[in-house]
């Protein structure tokens, strides 16, 4: 059994939580959270190749790693949500637009919010 505590030493820890067929049956898009550098990558997979379409900076404090963890998208595909597990002192839930990949709302959560 793999425990997340054993993965804390990895340089980049990727969480892939969502695959969406946005344009057509041959193109799939994934939001991938990178805990150790406070980014989320939007990847495109066409069945053969994976391409990073955009790297989204999700950190709030420039000198602190906030650690993006939980990531999901709403059923209509209009918004995606991300938890930042580390904070000052609590983590946050951020709401993004899938059209612009910009934050449109946020709320403070308790200590170390990881999954949704």
Annotated model-derived regions:
Residues 19-20:
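N-terminal signal peptide c-region/cleavage motif recognized by signal peptidases
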Residues 6-16:
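Sec-dependent signal peptide recognition
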